[in-house]
Amino acid sequence: MMKVPVMIAWLKRAEKDPRILDRQFYYDGKEDLTAMQDIKPRRAIAAGRKYTVEELLHYMVNYSDNNATSLLYNALPPQELNAVLDGMDVDNDTSAGNNDITVHGYSGFFRILFNAGYLNREMSEKALQLLTLADFPQGIAAGVPKGTPVAAKFGEFNQGEERQLHEFGIVYHPKGPYILGIMTRGRDAKIQAEVIRDLSALIFTEISNGSPVKGPGGMQ
C-alpha cells in the first residue's frame, strides 16, 4: 500500500521540475520482488532496460509491479517520503513492525488527492488518472456497473498462512464520488477479493437507492 505515497512523493518533485519524470533508472534484474506477490503484475519491467520515472510510475500504480516500486522507493530520501505522510496528515504508525495504518488513515491519501490539498491540481489529477488505470478488476471495480470510473489501489501482505488483501479508491458514482476502503484478512486471496467485490456492490446499490449527503469538496 506504500505505492501511493511513493507516487505522491515523485509527483511532488515534478511540481518543481517536470523534467524529473524523464529521469531514467536501470533495472538489472538481480532481484525479482514480484516473486513474493500472490497477485502477479500482468505487466512488469524487464531486466537490462532503462525506464523513465513516468514509465515506472505507470508500472508501479497500474500493475503493482514491486520491481518498479523498488527503483522509485530507493531513489527517494527517507525524509521526502516522511514529508508526504506528515504533509498529508495521515495517521501512520511508523514505529510498528509492519508499519500499520488504519482504514481512515489510508483513505486520507484519496481525500487529499481529490481535493488537491497536497499536490497541485495538475499533479493531483495525474495521480488520480494513474489510479483509474489500476489493473485489479476483481475488487472494487467488479462491484460497480461497467463503465463507472474507479481510481483505486490494492495491496497485499502475507505472513505465514495469513493473507491480507486491501483496496482503497474513489468510486465516481453518478450521484457524486465517494471513497471506499476495505481491508481483509484470511487464507484465500480469491475469496477475499470476492468479499471486496460484494461489499463494493452493496455500497454502490445503497447509494443508488438513497440520497447521500455531500461532504467537503463534493466527496461523500
Ranges and model annotations:
Residues 1-25, 60, 180:
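Active-site SXXK
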